[in-house]
Amino acid sequence: FESADYILFYGESPHIWNYDASNGLFNHQTHLFADEVNYFLTIDNQQDGKRVETKQALQNATKIVTSFNEFSFHETENENLIHSGKEWFGERFDTQNSQSFDFNFPNLDQLSPVSIKTTVVARSLVPSVFTVSANSSLLNTISVDNIVTTYATEYAKTASKMTNYNASSSNVTITIDYSSSDNGASAWLDYIEINARRALKMSGSAM
């Protein structure tokens, strides 16, 4: 094994994607306790290593694939609202009521709609609204119920909405604006989740 040699292998993220057959989309699931996975390499000098076997190429393909599913999400675990439990939330909307998040899908299949799901949280004494845009085009508005300040009620309210978007560019910028007439209101982004289709073309350099 020389100094310029390296090992390539298939690794799995602690964050996983699950297929939802009811809508044909993938939903992400963030690992509650880890952001990385560790692999341990064992070298046995007493035995020959494994080898990749040569396989014959298949003839007369019955199906031609020209695109594939691509998914991406933005979720940061910045704040635990009640300092207890497993629910953490990301960017805060109070002093900064508008924030943008950039996604990139090289060779995006523009004939297939992009599915964008946004989940948000708000703590407001009156109903409040999030406005979600993609590349400056309005996607949807998400209404969030007001909280009730009596004992044993929710500290904040959660809402979610999914919308299809016909993207004309591989770059998708999601902008979220928050509005409430309660001057003491606070809000948070839970996550943005995107399902898209990409053309089966190589992007980047060869290994």
Task: Describe each region flagged by the PLM.
Residues 1-207:
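Structured catalytic cores of large enzymes
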